[in-house]
């Protein structure tokens, strides 16, 4: 009897991550590809990213009992049928489900059990799942209307301060960090980058770690920006807890969750309301869990094995 295989894909705005596991939660393959938010890079590039991840994992040509793709940018105005069709073109499976990539994080946070999960990556949102499996979402308005507490928002807040430094109205290290990071040599270059050239949100959000670095070193403006964004996530999580009947626990995923300084501010913001917990599974393994559950309810040993692998990959910096 051939081994049952399950594939989960975290098709994010910055990169695509893919994991293949067997029915017992053992890892068979792991791969990465480029950005996969079709709203930012288009459907053709999105498909290329899926193929890149499949090839990187060495799983092209395999048949899967169940597959799940969490697409960044999948929402009310997205071509769901077309995204599903592309998924079938890339993956050999009779059982494919797709949804927004936030569900990868939500089901990974506590293995699909009650709790709140905050996503703090290029974008941001807060989600909750109750004992009945009902999902509630706050935030997630995108980079134009919201994304408070995200890498993109921290980067843009810092860039605006940097321009004030350029004008001489504020004192901060952020101007020099911005000029160096983006390779600007003049004010004309700054304007050209943001108003004329085409740059992705993830490229801009990549500046956020330098803002946090400046905050840790004592830069007042950088500290204010990071603290304010962390508190926005904390405030939204507390509002969620008061709105929905869920367990009083919060897991945080995304690039900013790796910053001790950011997490310290967030922990302070939810103190007395929510217990800050380590996610059971990183989002890509949350996607695998969804694929497995769509075929057959995952047993406890398999879930524990998935969690072990997820933890190993996180500790080794392989995610």
Segments and roles (model prediction):
Residues 113-166:
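Glycine-rich phosphate-binding loop of actin/hexokinase-like ATP-binding domains
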Residues 1-58, 64, 86, 108-114, ...:
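ATP-binding/phosphotransfer module of carbohydrate and carboxylate kinases, centering on a glycine-rich
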Residues 68-75, 120-122, 248-258:
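Glycine-rich beta-strand-to-loop/alpha-helix junction loops that act as flexible
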Residues 54-97, 109-110:
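Short beta-strand-loop/turn "lid" adjacent to the catalytic site in phosphate-handling enzymes
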Residues 1-2, 94-117, 134:
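Conserved phosphate-binding catalytic cores of ATP/NTP-utilizing and phosphoryl-transfer enzymes
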Residues 96-104, 119-120, 275-285:
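Active-site nucleophile and cofactor-binding loops and adjacent substrate-binding regions
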Residues 75-77, 104-106, 125-126, 257-260:
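Short, active-site-adjacent cap segments at secondary-structure transitions
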Residues 6-10, 64-68, 97, 115-119, ...:
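Short glycine-aspartate micro-motif
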């Amino acid at each position: 009897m051939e081994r049952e295989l399950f594939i989960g894909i975290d098709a994010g705005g910055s990169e695509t991550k893919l994991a293949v596991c067997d029915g017992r939660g053992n890892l068979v393959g792991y791969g990465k590809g480029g950005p996969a938010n079709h709203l930012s890079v288009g459907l053709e590039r999105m498909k290329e990213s899926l193929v890149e991840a499949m090839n990187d994992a060495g799983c092209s040509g395999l048949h899967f009992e169940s597959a799940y793709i969490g697409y960044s940018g999948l929402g009310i105005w997205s071509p769901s049928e077309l995204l599903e069709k592309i998924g079938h073109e890339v993956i050999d499976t009779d059982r494919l489900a797709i949804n927004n990539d936030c569900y990868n994080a939500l089901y990974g946070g506590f293995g699909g059990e009650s709790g709140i999960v905050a996503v703090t990556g290029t974008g941001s949102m807060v989600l909750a799942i109750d004992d009945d499996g009902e999902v509630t979402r706050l935030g997630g308005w995108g980079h134009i209307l919201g994304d408070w507490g995200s890498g993109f928002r921290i980067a843009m807040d810092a860039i605006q301060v940097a321009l004030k430094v350029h004008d001489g109205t504020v004192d901060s290290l952020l101007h020099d960090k911005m000029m160096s990071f983006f390779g600007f040599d003049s004010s004309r270059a700054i304007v050209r980058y943001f108003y004329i050239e085409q740059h992705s949100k993830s490229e801009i959000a990549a500046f956020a770690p330098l803002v946090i670095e400046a905050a840790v070193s004592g830069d007042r403006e950088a500290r204010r920006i990071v603290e304010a964004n962390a508190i926005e996530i904390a405030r939204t999580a507390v509002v969620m807890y008061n709105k929905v009947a869920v367990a009083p626990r919060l897991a945080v995923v995304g690039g900013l969750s790796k910053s001790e300084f950011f997490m310290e501010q967030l922990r302070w913001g939810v103190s007395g309301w929510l217990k800050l917990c380590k996610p059971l599974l990183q989002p890509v393994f949350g996607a695998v869990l969804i694929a497995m559950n769509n075929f057959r309810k995952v047993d406890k040993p398999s879930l524990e094995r998935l969690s072990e692998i997820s933890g190993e990959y996180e500790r080794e910096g392989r995610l």
